[in-house]
From Swiss-Prot:
Main localization (coarse): cytoplasm
Family, similarity comment: Belongs to the KdsB family.
Keyword Secreted: no
A single cellular component GO annotation: cytosol
InterPro entries linked: Cytidylyl_trans, KdsB, Nucleotide-diphossugar_trans
Name of the encoding gene: kdsB
Molecular functions per Gene Ontology: 3-deoxy-manno-octulosonate cytidylyltransferase activity
Reaction it catalyzes: 3-deoxy-alpha-D-manno-oct-2-ulosonate + CTP = CMP-3-deoxy-beta-D-manno-octulosonate + diphosphate
The enzyme's E.C. designation: 2.7.7.38
One protein family per Pfam: CTP_transf_3
Protein name: 3-deoxy-manno-octulosonate cytidylyltransferase
Amino acid sequence: MSFTVVIPARYASTRLPGKPLAMIAGKPMIQHVCERANESRASRVVVATDDARIEEACRGFGAEVIMTSPNHASGTDRLEEVARKLQLDPDHRVVNVQGDEPLIPPELINQVADNLEQYQEAAIATLCERIHDARQVFNPNVVKVVFDARGMAHYFSRAPIPWARDFWPAGAATQDVDLPDGIGYFRHIGIYGYRASVLSEFVTWLPAPTERVESLEQLRALYNGALIHVDVADRPPAPGVDTEEDLARLRALMEKGGARG
C-alpha cells in the first residue's frame, strides 16, 4: 500500500530562525530533507508550511507544497490539515518527517510505514534506539520509551524509565550509576507514521495531563487509548539541527563529503 510523507517546515524558530532555508552544501536544508524522503518508497512527498519564503524555495526545486494555517497549536494539527486537504482515505498512512533532519535515512521512513501496515491494531508507529550511556537515561532532554512484547508503547517520559529500584540508590545521579543488565533502555526517535483517520481524531482530543507535565504530545494519544507501535530503528538515525552549533557541524560534515548531500 502507498503512503505519503509530510514534512512540516516553519520559518519561525526560537533558537534558529529560518532553519529550513539554511544553506548546506549548496542547497537549502528543506531540499535535503525532501531528497531523502523521495528516496523512500513514499508515493508522495509534501512540504507543509505557513511561510511564503519556504513555499517559494520548495517550488524552486520542484517540491509539492501545501500552505497551512499559522495558528496550529502542534505539528500534528498541521499534519491533519494536510491530510484533509489531500482528501486521504482513512486507512492511508502518513509519515511525518521533521524538516530539520537533512540526513534522515530513507530506510527509517520505510520502516515506520511498514510497521503501521503490519500492526493493524496500531494507530501510530514510531521508532527508538537502545541507550548505552546512563547519562542519557537521566537526561530530561532525552525522551525514553517503555513498550510491551508486541512493541506497543506503555509510556514515554523525560524521566529515567524504567527505574531500577534494586540497582540504583534513592536519589541516584547520573555520575554514580551504571545501567543494569537484563533490561533495555530506549531513546525515542521523533519520526511518526499515522493513519489518516487517527489524525482526524487526534485534533479533537484535549491535551492530556501527562502531556502537559512532560511536554510530550504523543502522550495525548496514549491517554485516549490509541496504540502506538515502537520498533528499534534498523539503522542509527542522523542528528537533527536545533542550534547554530548543530548547523555548523552538519555543514562541515556534508561539505567535506562525509555524508551524502
